[in-house]
UniProtKB/Swiss-Prot annotation:
Keywords: Amino-acid biosynthesis, Arginine biosynthesis, Cytoplasm, Lyase
Name assigned to this protein: Argininosuccinate lyase
Pathway note: Amino-acid biosynthesis; L-arginine biosynthesis; L-arginine from L-ornithine and carbamoyl phosphate: step 3/3
UniProt subcellular location: Cytoplasm
Organism: Streptococcus thermophilus (strain ATCC BAA-250 / LMG 18311)
Length: 461
């Protein structure tokens, strides 16, 4: 009978079949947490020495070995073995090879259950800071572009139909606000991630006189978990990250969809930089917005990662279960997906050319000024519903005749209502329509300038 050399092998008389071992191994992906596993172990062994649970000289020897492994990892020199299952056992094996049997004391008062939870908290906390920095760069890009295009007029849409003329800067600031809320959600996510599970052990804590506050402080956490079962068994901080990432991706797909439309021949509102476009293998003229399409497409994998972990966690009894091995790949994949996608979107926006003249002209070949005429009549005392009816009939008349509201003769306007005077033509201009919308948060130029100023002050804090 084959001898079992696993670190947990004392209980077993036979070894795992190789193909079964490969099925249960996680080192192929959880090695991404190697740096954080080493840092957590350094904090743990420091505490073991300080509290006298192990001798100080042993703690220092183990700590030095871990620090050497950390340097080797950063230099790309560590090699991991699938037979050691996961990152924790790989590092313990490497440490044993480096400093000998004393390495076995590292795991005193610790379980892989609190160890892996600690690794994930450390990993995600670091990545959340990175994600927020990238979102803030995207927000800066949007504010700069909005400031440049405060006075650029474009059609505002509902149902993808021309609705009312708006400032392009106003349109961009809408996305700025969405991404600001995304950033705030990730900030709040840090609060729920900035908690140390270390010391919870397998599920019930430990009989050793550990100092959880010390390890929490050494790792830079705000505090330790107050319940050991909760510490090792829940992954809501990851679910929160995946949920926040899904909302972020949804927002990015919306602006990407608009960019895809805007650079088409049907719109011609923007031209993407060659550095963010691709061509066709058969059609020489093509310049495709592939990066925007990829961001739109990659939303599916991020949504899938959220649903995947929700399904893993559904009905899972306390405390640790092997199901929780499935909590990592979706998290890693989402981190990698959104960090690149944010940078790609910011780069596209920063380098695209805006055809502001064509944007403005497109508002002159539609009926997006119809609300201006209805409001004009309402300000002169006509009930808005009557004004709406009158303007609707005029639009129908113009549509049949092949011209627009600004082309209607004054005589015809005055046949419709004696409230209409010559100033109607100034009112119907797109620039006037935008400029007059002074209500708080509206598209009026003064309001857009105010939004931009508020955003700049927020970003500079």
């Amino acid at each position: 009978m084959a001898e079992n050399h696993k670190l947990w092998g004392g209980r077993f008389e036979a070894s795992l079949e190789k193909w079964v071992e490969e099925f249960g191994a996680s080192i192929s992906f959880d090695q991404k947490m190697a740096e954080f596993d080493l840092k957590g172990s350094i904090a743990h062994v420091t505490m073991l020495g300080e509290t006298g649970i192990i001798a100080q000289e042993e703690a220092l020897q183990i700590k030095q070995g871990l620090e050497e492994l950390l340097e080797e990892y950063k230099a790309g020199k560590l090699e991991f073995d699938v037979s050691n299952e996961d990152i924790h056992m790989n590092i313990e094996s490497l440490l044993t090879a480096k400093i000998g049997p004393v390495a076995g004391k590292l795991h005193t008062a610790r379980s892989r259950n609190d160890q892996v939870a600690t690794d994930m908290h450390l990993y995600l906390k670091a990545k959340l800071v990175e994600v927020i920095e990238k979102i803030d760069n995207l927000r800066n890009t949007l504010v700069s572009l909005a400031d440049k295009h405060t006075y650029t007029i474009m059609p505002g849409y509902t149902h993808l139909q021309h609705a009312q003329p708006i400032s392009f800067g106003h349109h961009l600031m809408a996305y700025y606000n969405m991404f600001t809320r995304d950033s705030e959600r990730f900030e709040f996510n840090i609060k729920h991630t900035d908690i140390s599970p270390l010391g919870a052990a397998a599920l019930a804590g430990t009989t050793f006189p550990i100092d959880r506050n010390m390890t929490s402080d050494l790792m830079g956490f705000a505090k330790p978990y107050s319940n050991s079962l909760d510490a090792v068994s829940d992954r809501d901080f990851i679910l929160e990250f995946l949920s926040n990432s899904s909302i972020l991706m949804m927002h990015m797909t919306r602006i990407c969809e608009e960019i895809i439309n805007w650079c088409s021949n049907e719109f011609k509102f923007v031209t993407l930089s060659d550095t963010f476009s691709t061509g066709s293998s058969i059609m020489p003229q093509k310049k495709n917005p592939d990066m925007a399409e990829l961001i739109r497409g990659k939303s599916g994998r991020v949504y899938g990662n959220l649903i995947g972990l929700l399904t893993v966690m559904k009905s899972l009894p306390l405390a640790y279960n092997k199901d929780l091995q499935e909590d990592k790949e979706g998290m890693f994949d989402t981190v990698e997906t959104i960090t690149v996608a944010i940078d790609i979107l910011a780069g596209m926006l920063n380098t695209m050319t805006v055809n502001d003249k064509h944007m403005a002209e497109s508002t002159e070949k539609d009926f997006s000024n119809a609300t201006e005429l209805a409001d004009y009549l309402a300000t002169k005392g006509l009930p808005f519903r009557e004004a709406h009816e009158i303007v609707g009939k005029l639009v129908l008349e113009c549509t049949k005749a092949g011209y627009y509201l600004q082309d209607v003769p004054l005589e015809r306007y005055q046949e419709v209502s004696d409230l209409i005077e010559e100033d109607i033509y100034e009112t119907l201009k797109s620039h006037t329509a935008v400029e007059r919308r002074h209500s708080l948060g509206g598209t009026g130029f003064d309001q857009v300038k105010w939004q931009i100023k508020e955003a700049q002050q927020s970003l500079n804090k």
